[in-house]
């Protein structure tokens, strides 16, 4: 089992060192680069949209995680970098055992991970006492530490969360120690409440590659150097767009990376433009067409927009049964002929109400109030 130590007594300053391999391998002799996969924000234990999909989405997060380990094995990846929030909350012992077993099945890959804000090392965290497999290197220090892989000419640095929020810019003063040709930083944060950082300072910190986590949308802050992998799978309806992982290679202190789409599902926000001639049946048909176009496996939030027949009211719950539709919002307005209504009702409350909003622009707050008021008055008259 892994046993960790710090050599802070040997190093008077700089990051502490944890256990690392000391054997040189054929890798350096053949001059190959170091192959790595960078993931973040896996959020094992989450139950996305549990009210709609029961526990199926939660299981899918585990399945996606297992698949990425399969990629590591198939491609003989040297390093799997996990930049925080492997778990959505404090991990259970049985969950750690399952993850550790999956890691133990990797025959060529070393795993380095940090704890993020969701799975932070609180006082009773099971992370603190868990014994990991020999190929797993958690960087669970409160301050920057590193693990050295001389056979890969690579050192990986990181620190972990001990609280849910850290407002101090802990990464602004970090620096690579220069002990290996390739030096990687695992970092989690980037907003005001989760280790804010200065991109320019971090870029000048001397690391070959900075593997970022916390922001669920994949993005490059600096090409081939400072990358948010994004969540492996979308976790909630705001995680729109594709999700996946970073695949890269390090050689002589420089990285070459590509982002790989990987998630089994995608949250898609879309709109359907409604016309006066539309009925609920025609809208249902268009919702089906939209889902078929973008994929039945994806999860949808659909907004109905435009002008509908004033006599039509859409049953959005019924429309949402057409596929993996999380929500349908009806933002349509009735297609009233206000000039005709006013001419026919000048001397009534309805006519006076329409006159009050004369000249308001379509789409304005006043126009919305006009539509709602007219609809209420007409409904009352019919009642």
Enumerate the predicted regions with their spans.
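N-terminal active-site segment of His-dependent metallophosphoesterases
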Residues: 4-6, 14, 19, 24-98, ...
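Short loop/turn motifs at secondary-structure junctions
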Residues: 35, 76, 155, 206, ...
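Glycine-rich phosphate-binding loop signature in dinucleotide/nucleotide-binding domains
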Residues: 74-76, 178-179, 293-295
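His/Asp/Glu-rich metal-coordinating catalytic cores
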Residues: 79, 88-236, 242-244
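A conserved active-site cap/scaffold subdomain adjacent to cofactor or substrate pockets
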Residues: 219-279
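Accessory, non-catalytic peripheral segments of nucleic-acid enzymes
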Residues: 254-383
